């Protein structure tokens, strides 16, 4: 009985601790919520991995290349939503997503976002809520 109670309490405490970590991991405190920006650049690298895939690209800004990173959903999520191998190094893409508050060249593409092949206009990825205002926008 005592071992069962200790185990149950341990599991409950562990669940609370882990749920707080997950909530903090997906928190919006570091990102613009209302402001969605668009950038166009050349893909340097794609990392289709879990839990979040990364797209790295060079964007011409004021006559020089700035290296951007864009965080997306996991590999399986992207593949199920239609992601193809069209996005590879050297491909020119246009990204629409949310930029960090700090102004760092980092974009979140997990909601209200899309990826377009710049040369053909083909939409490679678009979230279901693309084009909608932020949930708390007035």
Where are these regions (language model features)?
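Short nucleic-acid-contacting surface segments enriched for D/E, G, S/T with interspersed K/R
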Residues: 79-95
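Beta-strand/loop nucleic-acid-binding surfaces
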Residues: 67-83
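Short, glycine/small-residue-enriched coil/turn segments at secondary-structure junctions
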Residues: 29-49
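Positively charged n-region of N-terminal signal peptides that target proteins for export
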Residues: 1-4
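Bacterial N-terminal signal peptides
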Residues: 8-17
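Sec/Tat signal peptide C-region and signal peptidase I cleavage site
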Residues: 18-24
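Short aromatic-glycine-enriched beta-strand elements
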Residues: 49-59
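OB-fold/S1-family single-stranded nucleic acid-binding modules
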Residues: 100-128
